[in-house]
Amino acid sequence: VATLAGMYAYNQFVASTSTKKNMLPTKNGSYYSWKQGNVFYTKTGTGDPVLLIHDTNSASSSVEWSKISKRLQKKHTVYTMDLLGCGLSDKPGLSYTNYMYVQLITAFIKDIIKSKTSVVASNLSSSFVIMANQLDASIIDKMIFINPVSFHSMDAMPDQQSKLKQTIINLPLVGTFIYNLLMNPKRIDRQFRFIYYCRPQLISSKTKDAYYEAAHMDNLSLIHISEPT
């Protein structure tokens, strides 16, 4: 009982402190009411449309594109979106599959952008864009991928160990506790230093704070899509 009480107290502490800095920007933001939930997005600039889609790491959000979007908006209408389950978007309790994101991207372009658009995506999200283009080539103009996943890795099916991890992490108390231990500030700092950046001096504390906040919005995550590294 004492152990469970300790887990509960720790979870409450993380929930109350992780988002108090309000680091996720809402300027120029709106919500797209999609069939599975509300999706936060921003629209800036004028010109040919460009959609920026972030990675699916548990701490990812459209903050990933904050510097790039400022440059692109000088010549383009730039859209960024927080994928469902990420950032300021809704985090419904459902299975987050690749095909669900393909549907979301397709619907967003048709309903919000309403014209053929170029898409820039990173890591696993690149696969969503490729599939969306295969299903409907009329919605995407050009595709640019940053550090995309290999096609061989996309062939892998979830094994029993992966399913067990997902079952544990989805437990209301214990799963949340484990997730909070995994997605702590020190771990996020290591991700930036050894995965995201080759020049640590370029890492800003504001960016790390934004990722930490995104990782703990509503205590839900995409850990069943992309486990923390």
Range-by-range predicted roles:
Residues 62-64, 89-94, 155-156:
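Conserved catalytic-core motifs of eukaryotic protein kinase domains, centered on the activation segment
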Residues 80-120:
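Active-site loop/oxyanion-hole signature of alpha/beta-hydrolase fold enzymes
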Residues 154-209:
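Helix-rich cap/lid subdomain of alpha/beta-hydrolase
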Residues 223-229:
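Residue-level detector of conserved catalytic or cofactor/ligand-binding positions
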